[in-house]
């Protein structure tokens, strides 16, 4: 039997506000346990929540970026459950009236572009966490994270492979960091993914029983967990068993999922409207202000890069993976006047060097003006492609040196003396009679071999295009 995988993702996006969603306590990461737990998070008698305006503003931003419906009346609900890291005994969330509904997000998987519908994004508070280490078999409660503002972004179950799920998660991660509503730090829990996974016979309309894999904090773990879970469910079904709805944990060391608890449904949480919070009304004026303050979005900027700088669609997508990368490219391309070559260097040598050194673009020793200077020297004929790579390596190692200093110090200037180049060409032709005869017989590959010999003899300083013209003229 052929099986079809069905995946929906619920992603918790931690908003980068300085204070919590319902109190003035700090959201800073890494403090001593409970240093940022106010009376609201501790649920002391008589305390009341006060809504953080910035949370609403950031949620609106995401809704606009997802081309979604934004509900201007927002009601909060209590999600009731007992857990030690939730002193109130309930979590404040949104059930029936989320701030964002019916959005969409475009993903790219290989050469395919696909749109995934976003069901909703709702505001809620995070819970605290239990601490087990260093407490002599006891369990401690750290409420620093409690009350941190979250947007839970829920997709439609429209992904059919781990690759699509990872592409969706990466696209949303890129979008929320682009909008500057989340720092995107997965290691610190700023972007956590829950994957709802089920399988069904190919062609069947009805969904299979889903299992939810909780708190995946890396794209690699997301891919591994989904692939394992799909195989596990198929094995159960092919052995004649039934998949039981459950909440799963992923063990990255073993590379497998395991049951955490039998899955609860919405009715198990006994949702009801929170009587301590008035409805939040977003005015038309606030909506207009939010629209006016929206930055240029990645898709729009990518289209502009294609139109203005002549880069390919593929390069444009890479260049708009982050605002920092897009800004770097635009600065370098404007300064050099060379859009496509700038994109090639950024997506090629620069990306490889950053990856090898484990550096972010912001820490690159080759700044946008320095890359523009390098590309400019290639465009004006000072550097050949081969010499430019040597210049790039020298610029990386000598961050204070100008391109002119690099060229002079390392003797990288391309040969401009036509007579000297012609002399090398004559010598190579005289010493490569076989290749010459092959070219004259119509073998174009022989020309490349002769050009290669000239470049070798000139130590890469001859202009390949000029060399090719000279060879063709002499052998005509």
From Swiss-Prot:
SMART domains listed in its UniProt record: GatB_Yqey
A GO molecular-function annotation: asparaginyl-tRNA synthase (glutamine-hydrolyzing) activity
Top-level class of the enzyme under EC nomenclature: ligase
GO biological process: glutaminyl-tRNAGln biosynthesis via transamidation; translation
Recorded catalytic activity of this chain's protein: L-glutamyl-tRNA(Gln) + L-glutamine + ATP + H2O = L-glutaminyl-tRNA(Gln) + L-glutamate + ADP + phosphate + H(+); L-aspartyl-tRNA(Asn) + L-glutamine + ATP + H2O = L-asparaginyl-tRNA(Asn) + L-glutamate + ADP + phosphate + 2 H(+)
Described purpose of this protein according to its UniProt entry: Allows the formation of correctly charged Asn-tRNA(Asn) or Gln-tRNA(Gln) through the transamidation of misacylated Asp-tRNA(Asn) or Glu-tRNA(Gln) in organisms which lack either or both of asparaginyl-tRNA or glutaminyl-tRNA synthetases. The reaction takes place in the presence of glutamine and ATP through an activated phospho-Asp-tRNA(Asn) or phospho-Glu-tRNA(Gln).
Family: Belongs to the GatB/GatE family. GatB subfamily.
Entry protein name: Aspartyl/glutamyl-tRNA(Asn/Gln) amidotransferase subunit B
Upper lineage: Bacteria, Pseudomonadati, Pseudomonadota, Betaproteobacteria, Neisseriales
């Amino acid at each position: 039997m052929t099986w079809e995988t069905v995946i929906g993702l619920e992603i918790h996006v931690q908003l980068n506000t300085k204070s919590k969603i319902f109190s003035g306590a700090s959201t800073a990461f890494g403090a001593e346990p409970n240093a940022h737990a106010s009376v609201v998070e501790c649920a002391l008698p008589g305390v009341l929540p006060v809504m953080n305006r910035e949370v609403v503003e950031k949620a609106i931003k995401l809704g606009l970026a997802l081309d979604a419906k934004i509900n201007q009346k927002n009601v909060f609900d209590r999600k009731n459950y007992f857990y030690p890291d939730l002193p109130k005994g309930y979590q404040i969330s949104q059930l029936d009236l989320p701030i964002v509904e019916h959005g969409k997000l475009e993903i790219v998987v290989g050469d395919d572009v696909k749109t995934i519908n976003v069901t909703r994004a709702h505001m809620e508070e995070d819970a605290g966490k239990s601490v087990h280490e260093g407490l002599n078999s006891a369990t401690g409660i750290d409420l620093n994270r409690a009350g941190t503002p979250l947007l839970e972004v829920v997709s439609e179950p429209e992904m059919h492979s781990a690759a699509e799920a990872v592409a969706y998660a990466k696209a949303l991660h890129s979008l929320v960091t682009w909008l500057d509503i989340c720092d995107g730090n997965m290691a610190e829990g700023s972007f956590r993914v829950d994957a709802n996974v089920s399988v069904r016979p190919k062609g069947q309309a009805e969904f299979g029983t889903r299992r939810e894999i909780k708190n995946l904090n890396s794209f690699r773990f997301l891919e591994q967990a989904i692939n394992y879970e799909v195989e596990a469910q198929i094995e159960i079904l092919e052995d004649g068993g039934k998949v039981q709805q459950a909440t799963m944990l992923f063990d990255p060391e073993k590379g497998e999922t395991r049951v955490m608890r039998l899955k609860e449904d919405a009715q198990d949480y006994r949702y009801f409207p929170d009587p301590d919070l008035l409805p939040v009304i977003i005015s038309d004026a606030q909506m207009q202000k939010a629209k006016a303050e929206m930055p240029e979005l990645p898709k729009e900027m990518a289209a502009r890069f294609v139109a203005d700088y002549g880069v390919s669609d593929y390069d444009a997508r890479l260049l708009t993976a982050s605002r920092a990368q897009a800004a770097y490219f635009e600065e370098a391309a404007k300064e050099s006047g060379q859009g496509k070559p700038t994109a090639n260097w950024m997506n090629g040598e620069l990306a490889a060097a950053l990856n090898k050194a484990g550096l972010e673009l912001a820490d690159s020793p080759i700044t946008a003006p320095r890359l523009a200077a390098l590309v400019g020297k290639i465009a004006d004929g000072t550097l050949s492609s081969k010499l430019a790579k040597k210049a790039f390596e020298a610029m990386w190692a000598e961050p204070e040196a100008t391109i002119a200093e690099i060229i002079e110090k390392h003797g990288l200037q391309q040969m401009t003396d036509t007579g000297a180049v012609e002399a090398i060409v004559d010598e190579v032709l005289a010493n490569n009679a076989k290749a010459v005869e092959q070219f004259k017989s119509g073998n174009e590959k022989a020309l490349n071999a002769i050009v290669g010999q000239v470049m070798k003899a000139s130590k890469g300083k001859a202009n390949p295009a000029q060399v090719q013209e000279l060879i063709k003229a002499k052998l005509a």
